[in-house]
Amino acid sequence: MSRIVLRREGTVEFYAPDPRAYGSIYSAPVFYNPAMEKNRTLSVLFLKAYGATGLTVCEPLSGTGVRGIRYAVETGAVGRLILNDISREAVELIKKNLEVNGVDAEVYNEDANVLLHRLRDKCDVVDIDPFGSPAPFLQAGFRALREEGVICVTATDTAVLVGRYPKKCLRRYGAVMFKTPFYIEAGLRNLTGYVARVAASEDYGFEPLFAYWEGHYFRLCARAVRGARDADSNFNFIGYVEYKKPSRKVVRRPGERSLGPLWVGPMGDPILVNKMAEYGPYGDFLQLLSEEYSVAAPWFFKVPEFALGGVSRGIEEALNALKKGGIYAVRTHMAPDGFKTEVSAGEVERVLRIVI
């Protein structure tokens, strides 16, 4: 493949297809999306903050290999790197990029699931970053993990996960979804709940460490620990959210206006995310996530839901009013006018009416 350009992300240089030569990134023989640089940088910060060293890291859908190479160069955590792509041209480019950066790795040209099954019980970290849904790769991904490990997934089929295509969502993720003011968080929790159920089916306990939404994708990194008792505990955090405008509540059995099944437990580790913020960029974003993770409610509210006298207040005015009323509330990264709190919609409205 001759039509390539030298690019840079973080501290690594690598070759990727020249989008000008192919018309778009989607027409190139090897997929590389520069818009996902933030995803890759946050993933590097995550693995660095995770704190382990000598890890066996597998990226079964490598493309140019830049994610895995950045793990090896920038985290100090990787002892063995395994890169794979089903495309021969991608594998050639991966090898070239490894050479450019002086990184050693095992490189395979196989179907991702075939490789993951062959790596059974051998990986500490499996990072599944597909174009579209991670669902077809999750079972094999868990089987590749050791007794304790980390699984990371990206999902770009956000329209399916939030329920814009409800039948496809039901087929692919086994969840009933419909439009709500907090549909983005519901979509992220839909993905997380699905991954947790797959983890349980492979006898792994599951703990989300870092999860977020960014424009056109959801991202999740979670700890997995093998054991039937741990796997059973996953279902303590699987439930449904009943939405009857504007109220929300967690229920264990679905009703007519219920979303789910969803992950209704914690979405991340604030301590780990604060440590990520110490290592590099996106500090404000990570601080916001850390604050969000401190609120247990599996939803957020939007200020316009509480328009008083037909007038919708700004987010800062609403947060200040809630604080004066003794209610803890934080902003969410999922909506500019959104906030998370553990009190009911009725209590939010009552306080806003009194204070504003």
From Swiss-Prot:
Short name of any one Pfam family annotated for the protein: TRM
Binding residue positions for S-adenosyl-L-methionine: 40, 67, 85, 111-112
Lipoprotein is among the record's keywords: no
E.C. number(s) listed in UniProt: 2.1.1.216
Domain Trm1 methyltransferase: 5-352
UniProt KW Zinc keyword: no
Group of enzyme by EC: transferase
Spans through the membrane: none
Catalytic activity: guanosine(26) in tRNA + 2 S-adenosyl-L-methionine = N(2)-dimethylguanosine(26) in tRNA + 2 S-adenosyl-L-homocysteine + 2 H(+)
InterPro entries, per the entry: SAM-dependent_MTases_sf (IPR029063), Trm1 (IPR002905), TRM1_arc_bac (IPR022923), tRNA_met_Trm1_C (IPR042296)
Source organism, top-level taxon: Archaea
One GO term of the biological process aspect: tRNA N2-guanine methylation
Alphabetically ordered keywords of this record: Methyltransferase, RNA-binding, S-adenosyl-L-methionine, Transferase, tRNA processing, tRNA-binding
Any GO molecular function: tRNA (guanine(26)-N2)-dimethyltransferase activity
CDD domains: AdoMet_MTases
Family: Belongs to the class I-like SAM-binding methyltransferase superfamily. Trm1 family.
Function description: Dimethylates a single guanine residue at position 26 of a number of tRNAs using S-adenosyl-L-methionine as donor of the methyl groups.
Alphabetical list of PANTHER family matching this protein: N 2 ,N 2 -DIMETHYLGUANOSINE TRNA METHYLTRANSFERASE, TRNA (GUANINE(26)-N(2))-DIMETHYLTRANSFERASE
HAMAP family assigned: tRNA_dimethyltr_TRM1
Protein's name according to its UniProt entry: tRNA (guanine(26)-N(2))-dimethyltransferase
